[in-house]
């Protein structure tokens, strides 16, 4: 497995692969891998001759009061896990490589970023879109693999790729979960044992919503009201947002007659967790 730090070296490496007719798959990450990351890498391995994984904790997608400085990092552990699942290249750039002196250019995706995380984390998606656009130009992948747990992020990146005529496929993969249903996240390490139990309210909310949907309920307000009451009864929780939105526009819907996603962000203690379920799709929670 090769480790690349410099942008020009990554670009040269990928260009040589493309000229040789080799297919590149790419998994962008912020590191501190869990099984969800590894599932994305396994999918990338199936789809490519060369699998590139980036590890970069992108400062432009964190707000001033967020967890940039304490975000978990362990490169040695990550590189070992990556090698075990067959990663060919880890791209591990510095801030100076990604955002050099006099950097001035940012990518803004408009409508699909105005709700949910876009409301509660101003500037977040500008940072996400910018770093992904830059990474796509550096790695030059044929396909990039993203998890559906960050559903709004996936929609945003697909919109950017379509609007800017980027020549790559964006692949969304199902959320990887712990055995008890909690969506895997690098931030789960922040949770105390008591908070870890309370965090199950997110996945249980999805199950509640799916049950109501399967029983024929299509009124978004009634589904949200029952979930809100449940989460508010769980210790150490505070709802950031709880909404049912269109899967294409990410705007609130009143009825689930169109393709819709339940999206929620909940603070458990001081840790902000997200989860979602697209109604009508499989929900891999027991």
Curated annotation (Swiss-Prot):
<comment type="similarity">
    <text>Belongs to the pantothenate synthetase family.</text>
</comment>
<dbReference type="InterPro" id="IPR003721">
    <property type="entry name" value="Pantoate_ligase"/>
</dbReference>
<keyword id="KW-0547">Nucleotide-binding</keyword>
<feature type="binding site">
    <location>
        <position position="61"/>
    </location>
    <ligand>
        <name>beta-alanine</name>
    </ligand>
</feature>
<dbReference type="GO" id="GO:0015940">
    <property type="term" value="P:pantothenate biosynthetic process"/>
</dbReference>
<comment type="pathway">
    <text>Cofactor biosynthesis; (R)-pantothenate biosynthesis; (R)-pantothenate from (R)-pantoate and beta-alanine: step 1/1.</text>
</comment>
<feature type="binding site">
    <location>
        <begin position="147"/>
        <end position="150"/>
    </location>
    <ligand>
        <name>ATP</name>
    </ligand>
</feature>
<keyword id="KW-0566">Pantothenate biosynthesis</keyword>
<comment type="subunit">
    <text>Homodimer.</text>
</comment>
<feature type="binding site">
    <location>
        <begin position="184"/>
        <end position="187"/>
    </location>
    <ligand>
        <name>ATP</name>
    </ligand>
</feature>
<comment type="function">
    <text>Catalyzes the condensation of pantoate with beta-alanine in an ATP-dependent reaction via a pantoyl-adenylate intermediate.</text>
</comment>
<dbReference type="GO" id="GO:0005829">
    <property type="term" value="C:cytosol"/>
</dbReference>
<dbReference type="InterPro" id="IPR042176">
    <property type="entry name" value="Pantoate_ligase_C"/>
</dbReference>
<dbReference type="GO" id="GO:0005524">
    <property type="term" value="F:ATP binding"/>
</dbReference>
<feature type="binding site">
    <location>
        <position position="153"/>
    </location>
    <ligand>
        <name>(R)-pantoate</name>
    </ligand>
</feature>
<feature type="binding site">
    <location>
        <position position="61"/>
    </location>
    <ligand>
        <name>(R)-pantoate</name>
    </ligand>
</feature>
<feature type="binding site">
    <location>
        <begin position="30"/>
        <end position="37"/>
    </location>
    <ligand>
        <name>ATP</name>
    </ligand>
</feature>
<protein>
    <recommendedName>
        <fullName>Pantothenate synthetase</fullName>
        <ecNumber>6.3.2.1</ecNumber>
    </recommendedName>
</protein>
<keyword id="KW-0436">Ligase</keyword>
<dbReference type="Pfam" id="PF02569">
    <property type="entry name" value="Pantoate_ligase"/>
</dbReference>
<keyword id="KW-0963">Cytoplasm</keyword>
<keyword id="KW-0067">ATP-binding</keyword>
<dbReference type="GO" id="GO:0004592">
    <property type="term" value="F:pantoate-beta-alanine ligase activity"/>
</dbReference>
<feature type="active site" description="Proton donor">
    <location>
        <position position="37"/>
    </location>
</feature>
<dbReference type="InterPro" id="IPR014729">
    <property type="entry name" value="Rossmann-like_a/b/a_fold"/>
</dbReference>
